[in-house]
Structure formats: C-alpha cells, structure tokens
Amino acid sequence: MSSQSYRERTLVSVIGDDDTVTGMLLAGTGQVNENGDKNFFIITQKTTDEQIAEAFDDYTTKRKDIAIVLINQFAAERIRDRIENHVQAFPAVLEIPSKDDPYDPEKDSILRRVRKIIGE
C-alpha cells in the first residue's frame, strides 16, 4: 500500500451499542459520505451476526477512508473469526468495552498477537 493511500484514511468508524456510538458521534467522529454511507453501525438486540460482519467487512475492505475501526468487545466476540483474520495494518481494529460489558484482555485479538510475538 502506498503512502498516498494511507493519507486517504482519515476516519474512525465505530461498531457498537447505542451508548458507545452516541458517545463517539458526540465526540465528532460521525460522517456520512456523498453516497449516504455512514462510518458507524449501531447494534441492537435484533442485530444479527451477519449484519455486524457486513459492517465490519465494509469498514475494513470496501471503505478506503477508514483508518481505525473501534468495535465493542461483545460485538467482536460475535464475529471473532473475521477479527482474527484481519491482518492488515490499516484500518487498525481496536476492541473497546461497552457500558454493560467490561473489557476482557484475554479476549482481545491484538493483545493475544502481541503476547505471542513477545513469547508470553
């Protein structure tokens, strides 16, 4: 990937519950492009794993303007295979806690990769 393509990645996307997404939108991360594509996806009780996976795939493979994907850890657990298979540097995928689900470092794929590299 050229350095020019890295420069085009300027957005943070969010996949999470309504409280997490609302907080990130209030912080100024929300964006809707000229095609009506949003850089955020709200998970409700009716959201399927396939819908979460579709949003993740959109942000990590189709969109070339996303630099970081923030995903609630409970949502990452629902699509763990896709999280584990994402190995590109950009967009970076970071698992974050939600209001109702505390962060568990043992489930974090990035932390597991780091521990494997350093031999823990």
UniProtKB/Swiss-Prot annotation:
GO terms for biological process: proton transmembrane transport. Keywords: Hydrogen ion transport, Ion transport, Membrane, Transport, Vacuole. Gene3D superfamilies: ATPase, V1 complex, subunit F. GO terms for molecular function: ATP hydrolysis activity; proton-transporting ATPase activity, rotational mechanism. Its main location: membrane. GO terms for cellular component: cytosol; fungal-type vacuole membrane; membrane; nucleus; vacuolar proton-transporting V-type ATPase, V1 domain. InterPro entries: ATPase_V1-cplx_f_g_su, ATPase_V1-cplx_fsu_euk, ATPase_V1_fsu_sf. It comes from the Eukaryota. It is a peripheral membrane protein. It is found in: Vacuole membrane. Pfam families: ATP-synt_F. SUPFAM superfamilies: AtpF-like (SSF159468). Subunit of the V1 complex of vacuolar(H+)-ATPase (V-ATPase), a multisubunit enzyme composed of a peripheral complex (V1) that hydrolyzes ATP and a membrane integral complex (V0) that translocates protons. V-ATPase is responsible for acidifying and maintaining the pH of intracellular compartments. V-ATPase is a heteromultimeric enzyme composed of a peripheral catalytic V1 complex (components A to H) attached to an integral membrane V0 proton pore complex (components: a, c, c', c'', d, e, f and VOA1). PANTHER family: V-TYPE PROTON ATPASE SUBUNIT F (PTHR13861:SF2), VACUOLAR ATP SYNTHASE SUBUNIT F (PTHR13861). Belongs to the V-ATPase F subunit family. This is V-type proton ATPase subunit F.
